[in-house]
Swiss-Prot record:
This is GTPase Era. Residues 42-46 are annotated as: G2. It comes from Xylella fastidiosa (strain M12). InterPro entries: G_ERA_dom, GTP-bd, GTPase_Era-like, KH_dom-like_a/b, KH_dom_type_2, KH_sf_prok-type, P-loop_NTPase, Small_GTP-bd. GO terms for biological process: ribosomal small subunit assembly.
Length: 298
């Protein structure tokens, strides 16, 4: 008699310091890009659910902003609050760090998770940086001597290495139950939100070190017609000088932002996209909690 394996479903928070690859890991587990990524810290600013569905179960990943000690800036406070709030009503947590080192912000995240009493799985990301995996031994020794985890997984989210065992262990931590979302759903966020994030991703990528910290994107309009989405995106900065940086000489940089963002949207939405972009100034919006909330910061 064949024994049926019970279906499992639950929520898992993805926690860690900035720039360790939390969103890349979420995208890899979901199987498609739903969270934007860049080399800049604090790329992720909002909570987002990534829905990873497998024959054995469904993992609902709660991708979060990076935890950090600096909380003087209102935007940082709100992002820390969002990350901490993601621990409500989850069945387990993924603590993501990187293969090169463990620092004080990793300890901050560990202590936060340890206080919840939920199972915590450690993911050591970016192992593709090492040809000789024995180079990880000092870090693993330090972690094992000072911290306790349900399981530890060295992975490369970018190269999709080590994910099968991780998925198996995550499913084992979840309760038995029916899926929360249908099989074809990949996130709880709207296409409008995803469009704004894809524009912001390109702002970060195209500006690099010139990027003003206080840059955000608001969708002015989003209309769906058969075979075509029409989208208007406002890129907000705090100074006229920052506006000039985003636009670039003769509008070249803004044009490149629009072209690359449109290509990403067409790939995600599976339809043609007409995208317009503008840059506007709202002085000191990132220091005003009321203004932050109008831009969707929770």
């Amino acid at each position: 008699m064949t024994q049926t394996v019970p279906y499992r479903c639950g929520r898992i928070a993805v926690i860690g310091r900035p720039n360790v690859g939390k969103s890349t890991l979420t995208n890899a587990l979901v199987g498609t890009k739903i969270s934007i990524v860049s080399n800049r810290p604090q790329t992720t600013r909002h909570r987002l659910l990534g829905i990873a569905t497998f024959p054995e179960g469904q993992i609902v990943l709660v991708d979060t902003p990076g935890l950090h000690r600096e909380q003087k800036h209102p935007m940082n406070r709100l992002m820390n609050r969002t990350a901490r709030g993601s621990l409500e009503d989850v069945d387990a947590a993924l603590l993501v760090t990187e293969s090169t080192h463990w620092n004080e912000e990793d300890t901050l995240a560990y202590n936060l998770l340890n206080d919840t009493g939920i199972p915590v799985v450690l993911v050591i990301n970016k192992i593709d940086r090492f040809k000789d995996k024995s180079a990880l031994l000092p870090l693993l020794t330090h972690i094992n001597e000072n911290h306790t985890f349900a399981t530890i997984h060295p992975v490369s989210a970018l190269k999709r290495k080590g994910l099968e065992t991780l998925v198996s262990d995550l499913l084992a931590l979840l309760p038995e139950g029916d899926p929360m979302f249908s099989e074809d759903e990949i996130t709880d966020r709207s296409q409008r939100f995803l469009a704004s994030e894809l524009v912001r991703e390109q702002v970060m990528r195209q500006l690099g070190e010139e990027l003003p910290y206080a840059t955000t994107v608001e969708i002015e309009y989003f209309t769906e017609n058969t075979g075509l989405f029409r989208i208007g995106a406002l890129i907000w900065v705090e100074r006229e000088s920052q506006k000039a940086i985003v636009i670039g000489k003769g509008g070249a940089r803004l044009k490149e932002i629009g072209v690359k963002a449109r290509q990403q949207m067409e790939r995600l939405f599976q339809t043609k996209v007409f995208l317009e972009t503008w840059v506007r100034v709202r002085k000191d919006w990132s220091n005003n909690e009321a203004a932050l909330k109008t831009f969707g910061y929770e």
